Amino acid sequence: MHFATLASGSSGNSVLVGEGDRNFLIDCGITAKRLLANLRMLNVSPSKIEGIIITHEHSDHIRGVGVLARKLKIPVYATAPLWQEIDPILGELDESQKIVIEDFARLAGLDIKLVPTSHDCRASYGLKVFGLKHTLGIA
């Protein structure tokens, strides 16, 4: 399993996680343009991004989600309470791109467990990602 922090801090957050050449993003709180530039620096093709999973609705975690999902034609994964908050913010997405998850998801061949966390928002989650040989926790 591999991961890379693409952005961190109050100006935006995003993490790339993957196994082999399959990848997904945790959040996209930076512009799609900046995120794509960061992927290029890592030699990761945007075509290898299979989706975006959202941890919570703050703008520094979702700022670029809508544009990136439309541009790459990839799904966005979020819990029902999160979709209620982010749907009006993300802009027009095809219904097939809006994936509602509960406490578990499978993305880019990896199993992902959502763990509720305490934060100053309606719904917030940490993630436990299970790879072939390693497990990654992100909160």
What are these regions, as identified by a protein language model?
Residues M1-L42, Y125-A139:
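Conserved beta-strand hairpin/beta-sheet module of binuclear metal-dependent hydrolase folds
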Residues A4-V15, H56-H61, V76, W83, ...:
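Structured catalytic core of nucleotide-sugar glycosyltransferases
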Residues A7, C28-I30, E57, P81, ...:
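Active-site metal-binding loops of divalent metal-dependent hydrolases
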Residues S10, P46, G64-K71, E92-K98, ...:
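Noncatalytic linker/hinge segments flanking ATPase motor cores
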Residues N13, R22, K48-E50, R70-L72, ...:
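A generic structural signal for short beta-strands and their flanking turns/coil linkers
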Residues L25-C28, L39-R40, P46-I49, I74-Y77, ...:
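Short, surface-exposed linear patches
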Residues A80-K133:
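Metallo-beta-lactamase
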